[in-house]
Swiss-Prot record:
Pfam families xrefs: IATP
Region Disordered, residue ranges: 18-39, 73-109
Coiled coil start-end: 55-109
Family: Belongs to the ATPase inhibitor family.
Name of protein: ATPase inhibitor mai-2, mitochondrial
A GO BP entry: negative regulation of nucleotide metabolic process
Species this chain originates from: Caenorhabditis elegans
Function in brief: Thought to be a regulatory component of the ATP-synthesizing complex in the mitochondria. Activity is pH dependent.
Subcellular location: Mitochondrion
Length: 109
C-alpha cells in the first residue's frame, strides 16, 4: 500500500509530464483542447495556434485603431464646441457691456 507522500510524489510527476509542452502541442498541453487539429499536436497544431495568435493580434490592432479614430473625432468635436462657447461668451460679455452703458446713460439723466 502506498503512503500519502509517495502517492503525492507520483501524482506531481504525472501532472508535470501531462502539462508540459508549448502552445499548440496537443490536448492537455498548453491550456487544453482547441479543436481536432490542435488535439493532434505536432506541426499542424502549432500552425493552428500561430494562426489563432495572428488573428487575435490583428483583431486587437484593429480595435486600437478604431478607438484612436473615435477619440480623435471626439477631440475635434470638443475643440469645435470650445470655439462656439468662446464666441457665445464674447457675445454675452458684449451684451453686458451694452447694458452697463445703458445703465450709466440712465443714471446721468
Amino acid at each position: 500500500m502506498l503512503s500519502v507522500s509517495r502517492a503525492a510524489t507520483r501524482m506531481t510527476g504525472m501532472v508535470a509530464r501531462f502539462s508540459a509542452g508549448g502552445h499548440g502541442d496537443g490536448a492537455g498541453r498548453g491550456g487544453g483542447s482547441g479543436g481536432s487539429i490542435r488535439d493532434a499536436g505536432g506541426a499542424f497544431g502549432k500552425m493552428e495556434a500561430a494562426r489563432e495568435d495572428e488573428y487575435f493580434y490583428k483583431k486587437q490592432k484593429a480595435q486600437l485603431q478604431e478607438l484612436r479614430e473615435h477619440i480623435q473625432e471626439e477631440v475635434k468635436h470638443h475643440e469645435g464646441q470650445l470655439e462656439n462657447h468662446k464666441k457665445v461668451l464674447e457675445r454675452h460679455q458684449q451684451r453686458i457691456s451694452e447694458i452697463e452703458a445703458q445703465e450709466r446713460a440712465l443714471g446721468k439723466e
